[in-house]
Amino acid sequence: LTPGMKTIAGRLAYLLAGAGVIASFDPPSVAVTIGGESLGARQYQLFVVCNGPTIGGGHRAAPRARPDDGLLDACLVEASGTLDLVALLRRLSKGEHLDAEGVTYRQLQSAELAFDRVLKVNTDGEVIETRICRYRVLPGAARFIA
């Protein structure tokens, strides 16, 4: 998204950009390890790792996340049909997706996601290309007022 799109359209800009990606996206196989425990490899359509409850435009992807709890929250969405994904994304926007089929939600101190190919990954607004994403909590590295 361009800065202009974000300013003009707000949440709608994220939805429009996402719709284009959904239509052409080929879900990768992702080997997931959380806190040293392997969850195996599956095809995932979406994953987020958050320190707060919302992502782009206010969507509540990690409704249990708190910046001061010493944990990161991960939400992984298994690959599904386009209509199923669109319905799930509506629930995700409101933070009502945690009990949905195909959704894995964990609170963690460390995680690794290894993709079967290089992917473009949005890391807090910056896009990087990678085959592995590693996340870990660094206690005391930042101070927050909550």
Explain the meaning of each model-derived region.
Residues 1-146:
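Long C-terminal subdomains/extensions of small-metabolite kinases
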